[in-house]
From Swiss-Prot:
Part of the 50S ribosomal subunit. Contacts protein L29, and trigger factor when it is bound to the ribosome. Keywords: Ribonucleoprotein, Ribosomal protein, RNA-binding, rRNA-binding. Belongs to the universal ribosomal protein uL23 family. The gene is rplW. GO terms for cellular component: ribonucleoprotein complex; ribosome. This is Large ribosomal subunit protein uL23. InterPro entries: Nucleotide-bd_a/b_plait_sf (IPR012677), Ribosomal_uL23-like (IPR013025), Ribosomal_uL23/eL15/eS24_sf (IPR012678). One of the early assembly proteins it binds 23S rRNA. One of the proteins that surrounds the polypeptide exit tunnel on the outside of the ribosome. Forms the main docking site for trigger factor binding to the ribosome. GO terms for biological process: translation. GO terms for molecular function: rRNA binding; structural constituent of ribosome. Pfam families: Ribosomal_L23 (PF00276). It comes from Pediococcus pentosaceus (strain ATCC 25745 / CCUG 21536 / LMG 10740 / 183-1w).
Length: 95
């Protein structure tokens, strides 16, 4: 799997934005990716040093459209802790 295929998108929520102050970044990753693959991809794409990764599987939510019910897509979320001497990751382009 290519590095760009592993990291799908950053997660932009109030909670994940609060973690950025502690150099912790949250990303949606490929459901088949392991911690080792995620670490390698983050270090390769953003040129930073990763010291810790927490990964969680998020279940799909039940959604209804009239009498028809279905589930949203399940996803895998990774919270990445960078080392103190690593540069910050620019999620929204140049500021």
């Amino acid at each position: 799997m290519e590095s760009r295929d592993i990291i799908l998108r950053p997660v932009v929520t109030e909670a994940s934005m609060a973690l950025i102050d502690n150099k912790r970044y949250t990303f949606d990753v490929d459901p088949r990716a392991t911690k080792t693959q995620v670490k390698k991809a983050i270090e390769e794409i953003f040129e930073v040093t990763v010291i810790k990764i927490n990964i969680m599987n998020v279940k799909g939510k039940l959604k209804r459209q009239g009498r028809y019910a279905g589930y949203t897509k399940k996803r895998r979320k990774a919270i990445v802790q960078l080392s103190a001497d690593s540069k910050e990751i620019q999620l929204f382009g140049e500021e």
